[in-house]
Amino acid sequence: GYSSASKIIFGSGTRLSIRP
């Protein structure tokens, strides 16, 4: 769900891309 958004908001959020 927020995976794609986390990449934009949080640069390190790319790791969270595995999340729904």
From Swiss-Prot:
Main location: membrane
Recorded GO CC terms: T cell receptor complex
Superkingdom assignment: Eukaryota
Keyword Secreted: no
Subcellular location: Cell membrane
Keywords: Adaptive immunity, Cell membrane, Immunity, Membrane, Receptor, T cell receptor
Biological-process GO terms, alphabetical: adaptive immune response
Keyword Glycoprotein annotated: no
Purpose of the protein: J region of the variable domain of T cell receptor (TR) alpha chain that participates in the antigen recognition. Alpha-beta T cell receptors are antigen specific receptors which are essential to the immune response and are present on the cell surface of T lymphocytes. Recognize peptide-major histocompatibility (MH) (pMH) complexes that are displayed by antigen presenting cells (APC), a prerequisite for efficient T cell adaptive immunity against pathogens.
Complex and partners: Alpha-beta TR is a heterodimer composed of an alpha and beta chain; disulfide-linked. The alpha-beta TR is associated with the transmembrane signaling CD3 coreceptor proteins to form the TR-CD3 (TcR or TCR). The assembly of alpha-beta TR heterodimers with CD3 occurs in the endoplasmic reticulum where a single alpha-beta TR heterodimer associates with one CD3D-CD3E heterodimer, one CD3G-CD3E heterodimer and one CD247 homodimer forming a stable octameric structure. CD3D-CD3E and CD3G-CD3E heterodimers preferentially associate with TR alpha and TR beta chains, respectively.
Protein name: T cell receptor alpha joining 3
Organism: Homo sapiens
Gene: TRAJ3
